[in-house]
């Protein structure tokens, strides 16, 4: 890189992916500043909160690769912009994906704004995705070359301005190679396991966590025919397609097939369950989505043949855009989709290009 080095602020979590991201950019000649985000305040002494250790890992990595690092607290922004929505969605009977909103509102908004205040031209994260500028000058979000690790689904709510200032160095690299690089350069966290759980909240038991914030009320579990087969502990604790944890594994009711959560009747506090993976109540030929966001800069045309994901790691499903306007999207699938879940994101793709999407209704 000729001339003065370009300044890039890297979101460093203490994990392997963001650590290798910082090292790669340093090798490419960037002036790298590491930024550690603390976005959750409660239960810092909990066995499930690793914030202190994550920060120590960031400091150790930064010292090894020779970059400056600082910590910033976005807990207020997270609770206001992400967690409040998370609770509203669960209260309404939907199953939200907070990682999607966290990316749009925290990692690529609050974080980006802070990075710009530090004089950075771009930011970078350890996400597995790619960005390129097309001939028309628009920026495109693409799947990672390693499709098994692709995270473009979680990034579909970014806008063109955010995308234009973002680097994803790992988008061209297989995850196995990232681990190899970490070991080769002696990163102290080279063998650290990947994080899971709710964005920034960690891996604590979800039911216990949610129960602290939402009032719950037990109610009946019914079949589509109206037969009561059990009792649920609160509708917020269940999601469509759920098989484990519904308490009917040993039930003698029905035909012996596995039970699945099929619908929630919020008005009557009733959970509907069905037997069999391919029960008609679990299959959706057409979905509607709202709260649309188009990272591509514009929506697809009605009638366009696309592919869609209705959950992370799902294989692309062939679909047609039946209708689209500023507020609503309707998708028709070539094959009915299983357990399409209100609150999750429906994300559209044209090949490897992520166009955007909306919240399933």
UniProtKB/Swiss-Prot annotation:
UniProt-annotated location(s): Cytoplasm
Record's GO cellular component terms: cytoplasm
Residues under site feature: Interaction with tRNA: 127, 344
TM ranges: none
Enzyme active site: 102, 199
InterPro entries: MnmA-like, MnmA-like_C, MnmA-like_central, MnmA-like_central_sf, Rossmann-like_a/b/a_fold
Disulfide bonds: 102-199
One Gene Ontology term of the molecular function aspect: tRNA-uridine 2-sulfurtransferase activity
Entry superkingdom: Bacteria
Residues that bind ATP: 11-18, 37, 126
Keywords: ATP-binding, Cytoplasm, Disulfide bond, Nucleotide-binding, RNA-binding, Transferase, tRNA processing, tRNA-binding
Region (Interaction with target base in tRNA): 97-99
Chief location bin: cytoplasm
NCBIfam families registered for this protein in UniProt: PRK00143.1, trmU
Function description: Catalyzes the 2-thiolation of uridine at the wobble position (U34) of tRNA, leading to the formation of s(2)U34.
Similarity section: Belongs to the MnmA/TRMU family.
Protein name from the UniProt record: tRNA-specific 2-thiouridylase MnmA
The species this protein was found in: Cupriavidus taiwanensis (strain DSM 17343 / BCRC 17206 / CCUG 44338 / CIP 107171 / LMG 19424 / R1) (Ralstonia taiwanensis (strain LMG 19424))
